[in-house]
Amino acid sequence: MSQLQTLRGMVDLLPEQTRRWQAVESVAREHFRCAGLDEIRTPLLEFTDLFARGIGEGTDVVGKEMYTFLDRGDRSCTLRPEGTASVVRAALQHGLLSQGAQRLWYGGPMFRYERPQAGRQRQFHQIGVEFLGASSPRSDAEVIALAWDLLTDLGIQGLNLEINSLGTPDDRQRFRSELVQWLEERVEQLDAESQARLTTNPLRILDSKDKGTQQLLNDAPTLLKALSKESVDRFEQVCALLTALQIPYQLNPRLVRGLDYYGHTAFEITSDQLGAQATVCGGGRYDGLIQQLGGPVTPAIGWALGMERLLLVISAAAQADPDGAAARLTATPSPLVYVINRGEQAEPQALSLARQWRGAGLAVELDGSSASFGKQFKRADRSGAPWAVVLGDEEASAGQVRLKPLRGEGEEKQLTWEDALSYLMKQR
C-alpha cells in the first residue's frame, strides 16, 4: 500500500513551524488591537460569482488559478483565492456598512492552483487589513504605515516600499488605449503571455516577469502621466504624508496589482532579506469594488501579506541577526520546570503537582515515561527548562520536592510544594 501524502502544494505545519506562525500572529494581533481594528472571519468556500465579479474575469486568478467545482446542488463554488472580496461580501450581507466605517482584519488559508515554489503554495495563508468607508489620503498613509510598522517590529531588514497611482477608471481607460496602441506596434517583441494579455488585461503586461518585455516597457507610456489633475493631487498628498511619517518610498510607474478592483493608490513592500527583492505585502485602494458587488458607492483600502513568504524572510532575518526581534520570534520556547518523577506514590502526585502549578501560570513539562532518573534528567536538560523538580516516593511521603537548577550555578533545594511554587513564581 502506498504511503499517504499531502496533495502537491498543500503543506503540513509541524509544531516548530506552528510556534513561529503563532508568534507572528500574536505580534500582528497586538498591532491591530492598538490601531482599533476588529477581526472578521469568512468561509473558505464562496459562490464563484463573488470572485468573477470582484476580482475580474480577465485576471489570471479567475481565469487560471481558482479551485472551482459544482456542488451537489449544481451550484458553482470556489475555495477563496484571496480575502478582500469575501470581507466585502460579509460586510454587505450583514449590514456592517450601515453602522459606519469599518476597520477590519482577517487571517487564514487561501487557495490558488499555481506552480508551488518556496514561499508560495497552492494552499497559502494571508493576514489582511481592510478599511471600508475610508476615503481620505490619510487613510492610505495610515494603512501603509500599519503594514510598515508591523514588518519592522517583526525584525525584517531591507524593507522597500514601492508605490504608484492607478488613478480613476477614466484615467485607466485613457491610459489603456494609449498603452494598447503602443504595444500593438511592437507586439512581436512581447513574450507569449503578454501577447495574450494584450486583448484580455493589457495593464497586467506592465507586471511581466519576462526580461525582454521588461526592457521593452522601459520606453512605454506610464500611467502616472495619464492621470487627471485630481488624481495627481491626491497621490501627491499620500506621498507627502508618507514623507511626514518618515516612511521611505520609491515611485514605481510599472506597479499594477493582479486584481481588477484596484484604483488610485497601489503599493508593495519588499525585502532583500532573501538575497533578491521578495514581496512580503501588497495592497491598495478599491473604491469601486463594493458597488460592483451590489453595495453603495463606498471608498475602501487594504493590504494582505503572505505568511509563507513572510516566515521565510523572518527566518533569514533571524540568521542575519541572532539577537534581533526576528530571532526572538523563531526561538523555541522552553518550559520553566521539568518534573522528573518515578515511583508508585510519586507518579500520581507529580501529575497533580504539574496541574496545580500550570493553573498558577507556570510552564511545566511532566515526564510521563517511568524511565530511570538518569534518563529523565537527560530529557530535562534537552527540554531547555532552567529548573527540574524531582519527585520520588521518598519526597512524596514527606510532601516535598527537590528543586534542582539545570542552567548556571545554584544549589539543590528540598522544599514543600507551596514553597517551591512560591520560589519558582519569583524566577519567571
Swiss-Prot record:
> Could you tell me the superkingdom of the organism this chain comes from?
Bacteria
An example of a Gene Ontology BP annotation on this entry? histidyl-tRNA aminoacylation
**InterPro entries associated with the record:** aa-tRNA-synth_II, aa-tRNA-synth_II/BPL/LPL, Anticodon-bd, Anticodon-bd_dom_sf, His-tRNA-ligase, HisRS-like_core, HisRS/HisZ, HisRS_anticodon
Location in the cell: Cytoplasm
> Which Gene Ontology terms cover its molecular function?
ATP binding; histidine-tRNA ligase activity
User: Would the keyword Iron-sulfur be found if you checked this record's keyword annotation?
Assistant: no
Which transformation does this protein catalyse, written as a reaction? Answer: tRNA(His) + L-histidine + ATP = L-histidyl-tRNA(His) + AMP + diphosphate + H(+)
Supply the alphabetized keyword list: Aminoacyl-tRNA synthetase, ATP-binding, Cytoplasm, Ligase, Nucleotide-binding, Protein biosynthesis
Instruction: Using the UniProt record, name the top-level EC class of this enzyme in a single word.
Output: ligase
GO terms for CC?
cytoplasm
Q: What is its EC number?
A: 6.1.1.21
Q: Name one Pfam family in it.
A: tRNA-synt_His
Family, as annotated: Belongs to the class-II aminoacyl-tRNA synthetase family.
Subunit (UniProt): Homodimer.
Please identify the protein, giving its name as recorded.
Histidine--tRNA ligase
Its taxonomic placement starts with: Bacteria, Bacillati, Cyanobacteriota, Cyanophyceae, Synechococcales
